[in-house]
Amino acid sequence: MSSTVKAANWRFVEVGRVVLVDNKELATIVEIIDQKRVLIDGPKIQRQAIALAKIVLTPIVLPNLPRGSRTATVTKKWAAADIDAKWAASGWAKKLANKERRSQLSDFERFQVMVLKKQRRFATKKALVKA
């Protein structure tokens, strides 16, 4: 009997880590202030100190970002690393966009979604009966 020990895939709080603020805006960690706060900056968000409890770490890291980088440096490196495209391609971003789209549906559009789901369910049941 053998067992394999696999290391956990942690998201470390590190300079250059891209974070999600309020499930909306992306920013990157520029400086670690203390155990509970970091300094963040990004193209769509103002440079600010924020508690780690109010952000979510993403798997994306901005490579070779110096500690305490200024806004211009962060913006240049952000564009060079194409962070927005990486985020848009991630499943997490797609899920958030889908959630936002669903919340914007009108009553009739929700009805149409329900009808389409019923049709899809019926088609799968019909295929299972034939098999």
UniProtKB/Swiss-Prot annotation:
One of its GO terms (biological process) is translation. Its main location: cytoplasm. PANTHER family: 60S RIBOSOMAL PROTEIN L14, LARGE RIBOSOMAL SUBUNIT PROTEIN EL14. It holds the Pfam family Ribosomal_L14e. Keywords: Cytoplasm, Ribonucleoprotein, Ribosomal protein. The keyword Ribosomal protein applies. Transmembrane segments: none annotated. This is Large ribosomal subunit protein eL14.
